[in-house]
């Protein structure tokens, strides 16, 4: 199984670290440098556009003062010094803004209602606007649910004839534009449950022009990494750092030195490798960092992957826990005449061995395990899910039967996830209720009708989710948030910690991402968050990387095309272009691989950049492993 392979690789890396620890005196002065960066959010990490606050102007009315305050609240310099100019002296001295930020779309969408009292010496301004998102104290950016709103009150008073704020909320209110300017989206990295693969935990970090941005971010990233994952991701991941571990972080001219305290110094080599991996992957997102030194309680430690003083971030040691969840160049798999073919990175096609490629059993949907040793298929003729080895003597074995199965996905542990559509059963049950006698002995027709309508008001389960581990009975996945929601697609992340689902009808719906939590004998999906909110419809989705989806969707104006969607929850979906002359029907993606799309003309197109899609092969429903 995949998990076993990764655990072996991790053990090898630990052994390397143990050898390196024995020779710490060989560490180059100043620490190793970073090479082979990858992953994470780089972009505008090391740049900053400073807001020049206007400050309160003489003669401003109540509305104008609060509006100006909200604009200047986007300046984080000197602990919101500009925003405090709008307050009374007493208020400015005691106001302590919280780490929670409420995000609204734009100032034009904000409503100000003014009530002036006490002979125009005191006033109250009520501020209301739709809530776009919340940045939680742990840094997570959480998109708002439909109908959520900001509704806060500012108390004003006159000071020397000018309005000033005397009382206000502790929560920061920022426009989306302010968030884009002040915050940097980055990842913290933790491990999945068997410590085989790193998992990104997207966070938003505020920056200020008063201190070197890389210095700010490196210190904040390490502190947050040691504090633990966001509340949302915490139940699904693990950390190598012992509880209570603290660190000092020093940055100078591209060199970061992290000194972990005695708790980390007592860790065994395997755990020490994990701590190093989490730090390396987290810090290498910052492009200004050229050298990294790790100390344990003051003693310098050599890290795996160091060659001539250069830390190779893409070395075998670090790649053993790569967040991508897979290494090398995986093949894609597609259907042609109901049989399975493979397509390698050079676009050479081949009929796969065994029953999947040469047998007489035709499949409707398919998914290939991450190690490319097994294929799962949905059989349209007998309502079953079957699995076959991808080998010359590989034959299909039925693993699930008797349902209307619609979607398949493999995780890195070798588990197969299956979506079962219960809508036909629900519709039949409702028809039977309609045909049933409205009355029972002692009932009135009105009473029984009201009772039936009450029963229907409860959510009926229209989707059932299954988890199939090798050589084990199927387990029904507990997903209460999806109980009454039709799920048309489910894709589990390759690290096994999150799922992306497509909800709605056959014409497209909403993208949600939830966490995967394993109990002793149960599996549950929890805390779903919306993604790709700028798309009016989405018809297919795939994991492109550990922190990004590829989807087929449509904006309010435009045709169906490919988009890239970040899991950090903010910003607009990025266009990945469209196939010319043919409607796109499916999409699949994998880390470092071209996007592939199946079209209405039973051809598969490929794209390595956003501007050009090329026809690759004849076939339908291409998928990468996963």
Curated annotation (Swiss-Prot):
Lipidation (S-diacylglycerol cysteine): 24
Pfam family, one: Germane
Membrane topology of the entry: Lipid-anchor
Subcellular location: Cell membrane
Keywords on record: Cell membrane, Lipoprotein, Membrane, Palmitate, Signal
Top-level taxon in the UniProt lineage: Bacteria
Region listing for Disordered, in residue ranges: 428-457
Bias-annotated ranges (Acidic residues): 430-441
Lipid modification (N-palmitoyl cysteine), residues: 24
HAMAP family reported in the protein's UniProt record: LpqB_lipoprot (MF_01373)
Protein family according to the UniProt entry: Belongs to the LpqB lipoprotein family.
Protein name stated in the entry: Lipoprotein LpqB
Originating species: Thermobifida fusca (strain YX)
